[in-house]
Regions:
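Conserved AMP-binding A3 loop
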Residues: 42-46, 159-183
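Conserved pre-ATP/AMP-binding loop-to-beta segment of ANL
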Residues: 12, 27-30, 145-163, 170, ...
Length: 512
């Protein structure tokens, strides 16, 4: 039986043609505004499509052929989505990468994906490669060239590669099909509540996959307008831009909301804003409640990953309550599976309220085709018909999912598994704490303790934090040590790098 909420997959399809379909219906509508306090650079749907297909023709003139990889080493500029869509338009495979990567990291990627072309912004690090390198300064000359034709084909064919954030220690190239964009229709309805009338302002950079999907591909797919701040826009400027450019939706990572709140000294009203969106890492209840109090707006959170984008979310028509993350989007098949069925546990979904691994069915059109040149790693992520996310959660009686953290991040307290998310949620409510990350750190061989790392104006006594936790957490979950740091380490995707925190054995120097 076909799920009426699942997207229809056509026999012939091209992701770029789908995303830019409104260029033929509303060619003069503004598709993109790149904004600053000084003004805006605007692109119509007609201009976006012309630039994309002009670039695509230029790529073909370089004798690139279907399946060739195009590595994007581009900064926070409009060239990023244009090159991405141009490659997709003619069956090349774009490989978007973070501008923060070092030359050493880029060299590894070049070895892995063997690009046929690198599009390079001179301000961004790259590495030597046995392929042509096209400077971003050369791209505008191609925008007005002869437009290429969209190459239609099997919707299940390889469309693009994206790299994971490397939470397991090794970033992997994830293969996605052209059809993956269609799975995002379930997000439009059950996260964004998105329509062609919206103006979605995304606080992220062009060269971040969260911005690329939520901030650009999705608005364009429905004929809406995307609004992106210029590079290096300060967080305290974002409220002004939201007002001035009539944003109806605002999307950002949790850290951006926190930075805006830290600079607000009075409540603020956004006349056109309907609601806000958050993803990338867990949104703390404290940030969500502070934002609601200062703006009157609700932040709707979503959970996903490079391998499947977002598939659990809250939305205006189905808000999350309490500490839950949200609900499986309609059209998705999501389950909580036992962490270790080989230890005598059942193989199917665990009972309601029981912790386990969040899994999504392998029939999901947004699920990856696999990891690039890594069939064994791909197989290890599958259990029967389910893809294992590596994240822990528990399903509630109403179907919502409570998020408990990455499997890799789970801590061990005397043999009892503890979620860092649970501890962080409580500590984030302590007055004075701005950000917090919790992990276990080895004190000596085979002995680890739970440590909380936090940012704040001043040190907060361990005893004060322990007393705060005592009424809220079981004793074995309370951090044995709390350390104030200047900032929390993050990986190139902006997520907290707990692996780096686990290595902080220096915090025990001088202690017995």
């Amino acid at each position: 039986m076909t799920d009426r909420f699942a997207p229809l997959i056509p026999d012939q399809f091209n992701m770029a043609a789908y995303v830019l379909g409104h260029a033929d219906r509303s060619p003069d509508k503004i598709a993109l505004s790149i904004v600053s306090p000084r003004g805006a650079q605007r692109w119509s749907y007609r201009q976006i499509k012309q630039a994309v297909l002009g670039l695509a023709h230029g790529f073909l003139d370089m004798e690139l052929t279907a399946g060739d990889r195009v590595l994007l080493r581009i900064g926070n500029t409009v060239e990023y989505p244009l090159v991405y869509l141009a490659a997709l338009a003619v069956d090349l495979v774009p490989v978007p990468t973070s501008a923060q990567l070092s030359s050493h990291e880029v060299a590894k990627i070049i070895t892995e994906v063997t690009p046929a072309l690198i599009v390079h912004d001179p301000a961004v690090a790259t590495a030597d490669a046995d392929c042509p390198v096209l400077s971003t300064s050369e791209l505008p000359a191609l925008y007005t060239g002869i437009p290429a034709e969209f190459v239609m084909g099997d919707p299940n064919r390889l469309g693009y590669l994206v790299y994971t954030s490397g939470t397991s220690g090794h970033p992997r190239a994830v293969m996605h099909a052209h059809r993956a964009i269609l799975a995002r229709q379930m997000m439009h309805r059950d996260w964004y509540d998105l329509s062609e009338h919206d103006r979605l302002l995304h606080a992220g950079a062009f060269n971040w996959t969260f911005t690329l999907g939520t901030g650009l591909m999705d608005p364009w797919s429905v004929g809406a307008s995307a609004v992106i701040p210029v590079a290096d826009t300060a967080p305290d400027v974002l409220p002004l831009l939201m007002k001035r450019h009539d944003a109806t939706l605002f999307a950002a990572a949790p850290g951006v909301y926190r930075k805006i709140l830290d600079r607000l000294d009075a409540p603020i009203h956004f006349p056109k804003l309907r609601h806000c969106l958050s993803a990338g890492e867990k949104l703390s209840p404290r940030i969500a409640s502070r934002w609601a109090a200062m703006t009157g707006q609700t932040i709707y959170e979503a959970f996903g990953m490079s391998e499947c984008s977002t598939f659990i979310s809250a939305s205006p028509h189905r808000p999350a309550h309490g500490d839950v993350l949200g609900y499986p989007q309609r059209g998705r098949r999501v389950a909580i599976l036992p962490a270790d069925p080989d230890a005598g546990q059942m193989d199917g979904p665990v009972p309601t309220g029981t912790d386990g691994i969040i899994a999504i069915h392998n029939s999901d059109p947004g699920l990856m085709l696999g990891y690039w040149n890594a069939p064994q790693a791909t197989a290890e992520k599958m259990r029967n018909d389910w893809f294992l996310t590596g994240d822990f959660g528990a399903q509630q009686p109403d179907g919502s999912i409570a998020y408990l953290g990455r499997r890799d991040d789970m801590m061990n307290a005397g043999g009892i598994r503890v979620s860092p998310i649970e501890v962080e949620r409580e500590l984030s409510q302590v007055a004075g704490i701005r950000t917090v990350a919790v992990t276990d750190v080895e004190v000596k061989a085979d002995v680890s303790i739970i440590v909380a790392f936090y940012t704040a104006e001043h040190d907060i006594a361990d005893a004060t934090l322990a007393a705060f936790c005592r009424d809220r957490l079981a004793s074995y979950k309370i951090p044995r040590k709390c350390v104030r740091v200047a900032e929390l380490p993050t990986n190139p995707n902006g997520k907290i790098n707990r692996r780096a925190l686990k290595q902080r054995t220096d915090i025990f120097h001088g202690e017995t």
